[in-house]
């Protein structure tokens, strides 16, 4: 059983899909996927579960929506951010007000990472595990690194966890996919990640 000495960290990309059919707005929120995982883990394990949204630096809609409290009333372009990212499989410029409002009490925070980091992680994961994921699927993979002392979320873990508990933590990452990416395109992703890792 998880408790404050054996915490669970959950990191996942934010996803929102919206379509417009003849002036009829049809919006599908991603509650059935990653959000339900965080929601369920938080209900099951309480304060032992620490949930984070991971987003590209050029498309941090959930972070901006939650930080301002405006949710879907603001978009990344309102803050001069271009919403151009390789993580276009999941990234969008405007957060869902429904998801933001529902998940805010359950989230420990949000973080962003650059596309270059996602490509590097893509190549590293392929080399280490022979697992080929699309760039957007790698957003959450940086969460376990960021929770370590001296990293972005290190102050958070130091504040909320008892001494030594981080060493016992379980890290769960919602890796959204990659098996539908054409082989040639995946090879380009991989080559780019390898090149970036050598810089």
Please tell me what each predicted stretch does.
Residues 1, 5, 12, 18-21, ...:
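Active-site-adjacent helical/loop segments in soluble small-molecule enzymes
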């Amino acid at each position: 059983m998880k408790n404050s000495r054996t915490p669970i960290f959950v990191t996942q990309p934010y996803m929102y899909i919206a379509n417009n059919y003849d002036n009829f707005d049809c919006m599908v929120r991603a509650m059935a996927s990653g959000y339900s995982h965080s929601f369920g883990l938080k209900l099951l394990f309480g304060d032992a579960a620490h949930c984070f949204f991971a987003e590209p630096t050029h498309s941090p809609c959930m972070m901006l929506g939650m930080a301002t409290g405006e949710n879907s009333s603001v978009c990344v372009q309102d803050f001069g951010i271009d919403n151009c990212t390789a993580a276009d499989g999941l990234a969008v410029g405007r957060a869902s007000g429904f998801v933001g409002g529902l998940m805010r009490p359950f989230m420990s925070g949000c973080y962003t990472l650059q596309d270059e980091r996602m490509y590097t992680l893509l190549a590293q994961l392929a080399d280490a595990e022979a697992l080929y994921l699309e760039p957007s699927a790698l957003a959450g993979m940086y969460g376990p690194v960021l929770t370590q002392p001296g990293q972005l979320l290190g102050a958070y873990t130091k504040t909320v966890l008892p001494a030594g508990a981080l060493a016992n933590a379980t890290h769960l990452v919602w890796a959204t996919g990659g098996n539908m990416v054409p082989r040639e395109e995946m090879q380009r992703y991989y080559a780019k990640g390898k090149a970036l890792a050598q810089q």
